[in-house]
């Protein structure tokens, strides 16, 4: 019997690299697609690309995802060879926030937005589950501790 991770790897093996090209070609991807690809970018530790939004800058995960999908065959191979044993606690905490606990990022919604993105979502979830089961299960504790450190109640956060 295949584990969840092994099953998702089989799905990635069957994933047509042209699907990455199709996703990359979207000029205005649905939010569910953006969310899943933000998770992919997070796992692959892509260098941030910033875009200006009014007066502040934000990380543009969509541009980062397009850059990651520039070579579809390489991305597919990278997903198949992904070092799931060395995913950082910060990456797992972010995946938990944007994918695992996000009620707008269900398999049904992602499939309705882009069936091609569903395999990527399932792969991300299986990497996360593998990490939690294999001992990186202190994600929630570390994440809560990080939030407490970053946002102390007696020190207001400056908003730009």
Predicted regions and their residues:
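Extended alpha-helical scaffold/assembly modules in large eukaryotic proteins
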Residues: 2-160
């Amino acid at each position: 019997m295949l584990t969840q991770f092994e099953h998702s790897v089989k799905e990635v093996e069957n994933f047509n690299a042209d699907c990455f090209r199709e996703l990359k070609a979207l000029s205005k991807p649905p939010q569910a697609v953006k969310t899943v690809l933000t998770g992919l970018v997070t796992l692959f530790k892509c260098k941030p690309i910033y875009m200006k939004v009014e007066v502040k800058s934000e990380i543009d995960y969509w541009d980062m995802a397009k850059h990651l999908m520039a070579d579809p065959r390489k991305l597919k191979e990278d997903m198949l060879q992904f070092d799931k044993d060395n995913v950082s606690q910060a990456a797992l905490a972010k995946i938990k926030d944007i994918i695992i606990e996000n009620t707008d990022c269900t398999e049904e919604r992602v499939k309705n937005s882009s069936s091609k993105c569903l395999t990527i979502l399932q792969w991300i979830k299986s990497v996360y589950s593998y990490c939690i089961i294999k001992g990186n299960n202190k994600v929630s504790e570390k994440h809560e501790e990080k939030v407490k450190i970053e946002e102390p109640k007696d020190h207001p956060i400056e908003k730009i």
